[in-house]
């Protein structure tokens, strides 16, 4: 990796600190108190090794390193095809050669992402041309989208490269096949909205000339209407993968394809150059027409999360092009005043669903862009740019006329393949058009305009928001009824005049019965009025077709659109920042059994009822069997009484012999490390307290776990749990403690906003600011090193407690010297942490550099990009569709019948899987509770752990899953994913009743023995959820990103603690990446802008709706710096922000408790925002949330089962005896009246208050009548005397 000397020193410092920590951790581990005597987190391998491990092609890693040393990665991905063609990696058939070469190239191009090379390519085969020759067919699947356009296109090129080497002919399409492609790709665009839709001419050119047949699996439910039942096209269903590769791959990435064709001197691709150079160019109007309002982000609207702007509506977010030091990488900037005026719903770190350019954006504060314009109750119209002023005026706002600007970088358009759009006219654009300096006043701005420079944006109003006729009426009103008094323009206050001024966003206030405008000179000029308020001659031939043209004609100025493009948005997921805890949270991984009670308490176990011939506190537990190699004694502890470290013993569960292998050679049974022992918990607990020198009264509650579920079942020393309890810390499944935070990008910071003295920062290498000046002041801007992070202040306090715990551990348990000696968060600045994200099981080494007041984690885009699957019991019933019919069957049967044994795969957590033999679909659910059909992209088989988790719900649903399986629970009004072990009795899970989604309460959760040696799973596209035994749950997913103290991970993490199941190793630091190579991280970070301004060509391109790739040469992005020393430093930004923690720190959504309060706040805000239709919001909430819940719960009530409170037995109907026939316990319903009526009154109130359609009102009233007939009229409340006083 090419880096500067400064970055090289930075890496050396990090690795020096890491080496010191490793030496200390190794000394602690050598004491023998842990399952292993060595550290269990190795350093991560490079990209080449990841590709080899992912695909299993032995020897490919070394060849990749050789190629990458000589050429670019894209060229290496093509050249590797020569080795496959030469059969260097063991392939035999042409199909196998082609398949492996294409997958290897895909893995290389996507940095080893699983979905692209495995799930994105269905299969590779050969077809027959009409002349009898063979041709190559690549079947693409839906997950190919994750590979990106470049990798998609180059996979076709790799296929052709190897095809030629093998002597296979090109694909010769039939005319009807060409027409089928054109129709199908257009139809797919109507379903899924392609980011780039090629013209018919481009599509025809690609299909007729591409030497490879781009085929695909059916991914959608729709079928094509024409060109059906073609001989060489296997399905009539729309093929999404094919459409993506043709449109967003070959068409969109044609220049990159051509570049590699020329490098490799490949034949048969000349047509690419013709398509690039001779393709039809759309004019401005055509491009503009393509940018239409998109309401997808508000289709699944739910109660409590407000809409801030409807699609492209006046008053909505105005696009501002640029990047601040805390935006980019899917984060958008908003003025803090906007965040406050919008009711504090958008706190720093809140996710917002947006209309474009992507689907979502993280909210961050940028105070150098414009805030909202509001109308106060006094009638005054004022723009608010200051957060303090916004907080002061919040209670006086009558209407939010404009919500302000939204800062979006050029790179976001590039990343999302979205055409550029005209931004709001701003000062940086004005300067590029000749503006000499910021005008001191209005008069100077007019002077600049008279000199030929466009009118300054501060004095440009929203002229294109009003019609030319409105401008004419306003000019008439000002000319006939206006006067200038003491430098203030006074206009007669009429409803029409006031409304037009409000649409123009002209600041004004009421003075008696007149409207007062202080800065009015530019306003009068644009109205074509003189200073004496008389009409200028320009009115005689004024053009009345376009408002901006009219204003420019009347004033003689060049006037730009101040509105630019409006972007819609609504609130998404609220932020989160808190310690990671299992449910219930334990202090120690010590099995306490049922004797610990519901809280798994050591104190309860110690005082449990004495057994015969014991003093009490004695339990029986299933733990791992271990043997001392020195004295031969058998125990459950990691350290023998003789002082030697013990080893796990794996016995055959049938013959009981220690065979020293994973499988018994005699019984062919898998060996287990398991024994049932009697433990005197009280004696062990008191001995641990004494050895630590801790008084028993110091620990009010010490919590263990009910049982152990790993393969080895090692028992963690009680001492560790005691020391955690002293610091109020809870252990995670792998022995570590960790803290979850929402990630936000940051490339620069100031000392005064991170709470660290400049002296300490200088010690850490921050000696100069971004502009090369020596660091002497705490308001200088410093460039963040890409492995330095900021954590929230809450996380800082938590880290201090962890540091004290680790020091206590080193001193009291391991007999070593303390390491951190921290008393306050500042003491930990400069220390190393480990960042961990889901889906990779890889930690990233980072250094703590400061603290954020906002409850988020700020890190470099490279850090976030560097961090980027759980199973069912075999008899779990799932419902699947093959596109023709629905069928219900056990998951074991479905997986085994559809596992393609000829092409099994092995993913990064060691799970075998394959694509299903044919396309299947399941019902899937998103976080808002909306269901849809999604394709099954793979099936998998896993070795079962010893124990599973079984849930039962009030409605009689029962589901058995592995302990780490991703479950869905309702968090007020959205679905949150947690692990099965964290699900608690009382949690509400989504279930399917009569085709509807309703909430069902978990009434029991127990750990059960696995009766089968295998568990099974599906991978589902997009939402990664499905229905199992009637319960919506996850499949293969992760959790939030988190951080942990480095030494805690090095000392306490052990693979031996991890659950023995697929997913058990997820979210665990199996490897540690010590150096982040920008070229190997997620490519989204490569689209981060690193320039300090955009040239005029970019703004002109925005006016022409150009594609960002056409302007790539004008914008300095990370991608252009890869492979040079500048790839890690020298980044700049276009917009300043004074405080990265400005604005609300907690969302109103989180602060409000009940749904009623949240709904009232949502609708009240909708009433006040001009860009929002409150009646439509109310109706959408009814249709997509409340009515669906009411109907589903009512249906469930009528079909419910009854349950025994004692033994949890379920009955379809009440037993005739009126009690449980098994145990005689009391039998109760599983669905209660309150859950059915929950949203009824709220729904009726909405219908009475808002303009709801008659149809929706009638639906609510029908539900009301059905509920009333079911439960009867509510009883009248007995009133007392106090009720009348």
Swiss-Prot record:
Protein name: DNA polymerase II large subunit
Catalytic reactions on record: DNA(n) + a 2'-deoxyribonucleoside 5'-triphosphate = DNA(n+1) + diphosphate; Exonucleolytic cleavage in the 3'- to 5'-direction to yield nucleoside 5'-phosphates
GO biological process per UniProt: DNA catabolic process; DNA-templated DNA replication; intein-mediated protein splicing
Family: Belongs to the archaeal DNA polymerase II family.
Post-translational modification: This protein undergoes a protein self splicing that involves a post-translational excision of the intervening region (intein) followed by peptide ligation.
Keywords: Autocatalytic cleavage, DNA replication, DNA-binding, DNA-directed DNA polymerase, Exonuclease, Hydrolase, Multifunctional enzyme, Nuclease, Nucleotidyltransferase, Protein splicing, Transferase
Subunit composition and interactions: Heterodimer of a large subunit and a small subunit.
Residue ranges of the region described as Disordered: 565-586
This enzyme's EC code(s): 2.7.7.7, 3.1.11.1
UniProt xrefs under PANTHER family: DNA POLYMERASE II LARGE SUBUNIT
Signal peptide limits: none
Keyword Secreted in annotation: no
Gene symbol of the encoding locus: polC
